[in-house]
Structure formats: C-alpha cells, structure tokens
C-alpha cells in the first residue's frame, strides 16, 4: 500500500524524516518495501500484514507512528456544512441479508456540481497512484485512503424507485460494472440494488448505470460494512481486485461507517457545493459487540523477557486506541479485529517496546536432550519402512471435502464432522483432512504421471474430526501407507512380480516388530474405499481395532485414473504406539540345521491367512519354528470360489538334528489339521 509522507506529516506533525519513518515503521512490523521521491513528497510502499486491515489507511499508519514517537494524532476537525431535510424522507434502505451486510448507511447531497478536483486533491491522489476522475469520485477515494473506509457515490436520480435494497443476486442476473465489463452473477453474491435492478457489487465496485456524470446534481453516499468472506468469494469468482474489496475482505471498521461518511459529505459540500440531508439512514441490525481484555503486567516478561513499566504499557495501548476501563483491563477499539486475547495485548506492547530488545534465551530444561519413548518408536518405524523401500511423504493438511474414504475405526461415525476452515487460503482446500489417503493417492498420481510406475510411500501426520458441536477439532496421529507397481527391482535375477496385499502387510508387520510392539492381527472386513474380499481390519496387540488395509476399490481407483493395482492402509498410530510391548526373550543361536517343507492348499477364498497361521500354532509342534507364505494364486484352472495358498514350514530341534521320519510326522500332522479345519485340498 502506498503512503504519502506529507499526508502522514499532516496527521502526526512527526519529527521523523521519511527515511527515519521507514526504519521505525519496519521495526514495529510494518515493513516498508520501498521509499521513493514523488515531486516534493515521498511515497512509502508499506507491506501491511493480512491481519491488520486498520493499517490500510493513512490514519492507521499515522497512529502507529505517533506511538513510536510518543506524539499525538491530528485528525481533521469537523467542518460546518449546510443541511436541510431528512434522508428518510427522500429514500429508504432495506437489508435483506443481514449476515452479509450487518450495517448500511446512506446520506443524500442535493445540488452538487460535478467538475475536476482542486489541484491539491488531484495531486495527493496521483502521489499514491490514484487517477483523478471528478471531484465527487475523488473525494470518496481520498476518504478511503485517509480513514480506510470504502465509500461509493450513486447518481441519486438514476436509482429506480429512489431506494436502496441490499440483497443477494438472482441466478444469472447481469450487472455492468464501472470498468465496462458485463458480469453474470450467482445467488451467493451480494449486490446493492434499487427497486428494479442491481446497481453495484457490494464491497467491490459500483455499476455503470448509476455512475456519477457531469449531469449529476444529487448524489447518495454509501458507507457500509460487508461480510469479509462474501466479498472475498465474489471478488475471486469474478476475477476482481479493487481498493474497496482489499479492505472489506480483510475486515473494515463497522463502527467507522458514519465517521467516514460524515467526512466525505463535508468535503463534497466544500468542493462541489450542494446541501446535505441532516442525517443518514443508518440500518445497523447487528451492532458491534465491545471486547474488554485484561492484561496482567507479569505476562509480558513471562512471554517476551521484556520488562516494561506499567505507565509505558498504558501509554502504548492508549496510543493505539485501547481504552482503559480498569487498572489492568482495556476496551478493544472496533478497528482492531485481530486483538482477541491477552497475548495479543502483550504483542502490541512488545512491538512498540522493540523486538530487538528481547533477550535470546534457551528454554528451561530439567534434563539433557533426548527422544521420548514415543519419538523413539516413530524413528524406528520410519527406519523400518525405509528399509522396506518406502519413502516418506508430507502432504497438505487442507483438502477438498472427500467422503470416498472410510475413516479409521476410532473415528467411524464422524464422517460428516470434518472441520471446515472459516477463512481458507485456497477455495479448493477449505477442509481439514480426516484421512491421510487423499494426499498420498494424489502423490501416487503425480508419480505415475511422470512415468514412475513403482511407488511406495508412507506418511505420519495428524488428521482432524469434530466429536461435539462447538468444540475444537480432535487431532489423531495417523499412519498411511500406499504401494503399487513391481515387488522387485528390474535388475534382480528373479522375474519381477506385482506388489500385492501381503507385501504391504509384511512391511507393516516389520515396522511394528522394529518398535518392539506385540504383533498385529488381521481379520476380514469391508470398507467402502477397499475392494471386497481384499481388505482386512487391523487390530493391535490388545485386540483394539486401529485401522484397515487392502486393495483400493475400483470406484476410487477410477476417479484417480489408476490403471494398476494399488494397496493402501491407514491406522491410528497413537493407539498403536500405546499398545502392549512384546516380551523379548533371548536364546542361543541354533546349533543344529533346520529342514523346510512346502505345502500347497486349495482353500475357499474367504479363508484368511491369519486363520491358517492360528491352526498351525495351535497344533503346538514345538519343533515347527516358523511358517511363511510363499505365495497365492487365483484363476486359471482354479475354481472362482477357491484360491491356492503355498506355505513354507521350518522344522528344527535345539537338542539334535531331526531325522526325516520325524519331520515327515510333524508335517503330516500339520497338513492334516489344515485340510480338516478348512475342508481344503492338497495340491
């Protein structure tokens, strides 16, 4: 924003030069990007923080400068003007949507003479990059840059029915704005209308049909407060960015509406003649609610290490417009929408005391730096997944609302309670994520688009849901893993095969084992984002359901344009880390050789591998040391309801070398148990 140094001087009588003002304002958080000479004046290009709309005016910057210099603010004194009649006799104002327009004031000036602005006004506007138009339009622009309140002047004779209606636009309604562009409006856009048609886009730009012209004699001055979100949304949809919209979408001063209008009316009467009505029609259905905040002096050194005298605290806050109402309590001015709590007052004092005076201190610590147990487990988890070929991803926490994915078990029932941002930076990312999967799948899609077919990713991050209305979102630490492509690198001797469910399951089990946690169990389940028959519920060592794993459902895969199988899992990592740890037992290295035997079974497709393992372990064959899955096969000559499962069993004794007949006896016993339990066939 461009600020005139001479204009600042008129408001502050500052002793600072333009260069000194630039330096001092930068030190209180109002960075000056550039300082340039403009004739006899200097122009400061101020980078105003997004939460400080009060500084989008010369008075706002001047207020900061007076506190820095311990000076005072010299606001223009009210000027007497000629008035006659009441506004309510000549016009009326109706607000049909009070949520989007909490306040609207209208005042009429009759008998004005439109012409060029005085040289001082035209030069002042040109200094800050504004093109002079005519005296009335220039005065509204001048007051906007002086006080920060956008205003608009209508040709009163061109208003149908001589009235103002603040309403939403009708779908498809047309309005030609002052830039000559015909715009098609939607039902969520707020307009200023007369009795017949829209005449302005609320808070953005006026309409061409009600524009001030050389023939104008009567004007209606609008001063209002519009909902920031509504103005921002409309401006973005229409691709518009105006001086008015920049201020309204950040938050204007709803209590400054009449003050700015009065200033505008005085200047018009002085420069364009005319007689103003005695008062304004001020429709204010939802008055400003004052905020009072207490500031404990001891909080300032506690938060900033700055020691500030009580008198200095009071001087700074009063200079910034805060009114003391008790010893340590202050009323927040209406233009400071960013101040909501005690810490905000501490920040104001710290800014003007000097951030450079804050001492560098290490935070207090009662012990040497070390990782906490949960952090150690997460480090082990990351290392294990890296060793399995997975890369860690970090995706955006703000996403589009997405109900394609079933939440992890602890959050089921809250699918419709995904937190929505009140002020999203990006319209397509207006929701806080309740699952990690959309971000991971988008990363997979990005890799596939760039020719990378083999993708293995995991993410550790927080997901958000609302359990009770009115409460803050509940945060859950989650783990998401996705895998697709080949299971082996192309330069290996063994032929490449496709990743499958068991590769992903094995990687998870290896990661859990690295954290010294009790083994997980898997039971067949169904989830809307997973393929039927290829999904499982993940349970921690204490039997708590913590997540799901499986192949991505065709409907979801199609929406992402995946043409190859993709396997995913998501679980509640916090619940997993809180699960029971396994008891570590040490044993000597085996002294005797082991013997392996394979067995291939034809089982029903619904038989879970975990159930097969359970049967083997329940036989209590002490010399059966391990059972592993070699592979599964479906299709071909195998019936559609069946699948082939090949297991490898390892036998070994700690006392001697097993004889062939002993191994065969063990193997026959386990084979019979599996055949009988699952009505299986041996292949």
Where are these regions (language model features)?
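RNA/tRNA-interacting regions in translation and RNA-turnover enzymes
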Residues: 1-374, 379-381
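A carboxyl-terminal module marker
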Residues: 2-5, 20-23, 319-321, 338, ...
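Conserved alpha/beta core surface patches that mediate binding of polyanionic ligands
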Residues: 77-89, 195-232, 262, 266, ...
């Amino acid at each position: 924003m461009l600020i005139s140094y001479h204009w600042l001087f008129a408001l502050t009588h500052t002793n600072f030069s333009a260069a000194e003002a630039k330096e001092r304002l930068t030190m209180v958080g109002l960075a000056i990007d550039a300082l340039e000479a403009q004739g006899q004046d200097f122009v400061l290009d101020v980078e105003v923080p997004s939460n400080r709309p009060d500084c989008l005016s010369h008075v706002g910057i001047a207020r900061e400068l007076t506190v820095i210099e311990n000076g005072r603010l010299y606001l223009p004194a009210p000027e007497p003007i000629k008035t006659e009649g009441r506004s309510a006799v000549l016009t009326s104002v109706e607000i049909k949507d009070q949520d989007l327009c909490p306040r609207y004031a209208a005042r009429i000036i009759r008998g004005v003479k439109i012409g060029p602005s005085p040289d001082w006004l035209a030069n002042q506007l040109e200094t800050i990059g504004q093109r002079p138009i005519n005296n009335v339009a220039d005065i509204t622009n001048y007051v906007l840059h002086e006080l920060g309140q956008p205003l608009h002047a209508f040709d009163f004779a061109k208003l149908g029915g001589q009235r103002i209606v603040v309403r939403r636009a009708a779908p498809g309604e047309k309005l030609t704005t002052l830039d000559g562009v015909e715009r098609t409006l939607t039902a969520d856009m707020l307009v200023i209308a007369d009795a017949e048609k829209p005449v302005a886009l609320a808070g953005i730009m006026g309409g061409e049909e009600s524009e001030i012209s050389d023939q104008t004699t009567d004007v209606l001055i609008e001063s209002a407060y519009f909902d920031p979100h509504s103005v921002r949304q409309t401006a973005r949809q229409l691709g518009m960015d105006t001086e008015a919209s920049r201020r309204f979408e950040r938050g204007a001063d709803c209590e400054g509406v009449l003050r700015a209008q009065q200033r505008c009316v005085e200047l018009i009467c002085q420069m364009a003649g005319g007689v103003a009505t005695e008062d304004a029609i001020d429709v204010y259905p939802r008055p400003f609610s004052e905020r009072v905040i207490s500031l404990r002096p001891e909080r300032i050194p506690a938060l900033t290490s700055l020691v500030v005298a009580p008198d200095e605290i009071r001087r700074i806050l009063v200079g910034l417009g805060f009114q003391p109402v008790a010893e340590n309590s202050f009323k927040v001015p209406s233009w400071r929408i960013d101040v909501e709590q005690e810490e905000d007052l501490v920040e104001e004092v710290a800014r003007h005391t000097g951030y450079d005076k804050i001492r560098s201190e290490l935070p207090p610590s009662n012990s040497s730096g070390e990782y906490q147990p949960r952090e150690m487990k997460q480090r082990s988890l990351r290392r294990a997944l890296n060793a399995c070929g997975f890369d860690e991803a970090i995706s955006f926490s703000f996403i589009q609302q997405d109900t394609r994915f079933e939440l992890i078990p602890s959050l089921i029932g809250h699918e419709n309670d995904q937190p929505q941002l009140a002020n999203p930076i990006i319209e397509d990312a207006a929701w806080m994520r309740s699952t990690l999967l959309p971000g991971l799948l988008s990363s997979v899609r990005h890799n596939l688009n760039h020719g990378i077919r083999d993708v293995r990713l995991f993410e550790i991050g927080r997901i958000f849901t609302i359990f009770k209305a009115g409460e803050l979102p509940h945060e859950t630490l989650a783990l998401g893993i996705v895998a697709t492509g080949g299971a082996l690198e192309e330069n290996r001797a063994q032929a490449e095969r496709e990743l499958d469910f068991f590769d992903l399951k094995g990687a998870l089990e290896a990661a859990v084992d690295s954290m010294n946690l009790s083994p997980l169990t898997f039971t067949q389940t169904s989830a809307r984002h997973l393929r039927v028959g290829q999904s499982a519920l993940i349970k921690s060592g204490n039997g708590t359901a913590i997540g799901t794993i499986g192949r991505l459902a065709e409907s979801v895969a199609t929406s992402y344009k995946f043409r190859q199988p993709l396997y995913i899992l998501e679980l509640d990592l916090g619940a997993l880390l809180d699960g029971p740890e396994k008891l570590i037992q040490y044993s000597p290295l085996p002294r005797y050789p082991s013997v392996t035997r394979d067995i291939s079974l034809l089982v029903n497709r619904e038989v879970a591998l975990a159930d097969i393992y359970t049967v083997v372990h329940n036989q209590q064959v002490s010399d059966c040391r391990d059972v592993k899955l070699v592979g599964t096969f479906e299709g071909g000559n195998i019936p559609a309801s069946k699948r082939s499962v090949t297991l490898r069993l390892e036998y070994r004794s700690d006392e001697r070398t097993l004889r062939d007949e002993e191994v065969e006896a063990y193997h026959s016993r386990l084979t019979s148990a599996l055949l009988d339990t699952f009505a299986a066939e041996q292949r």
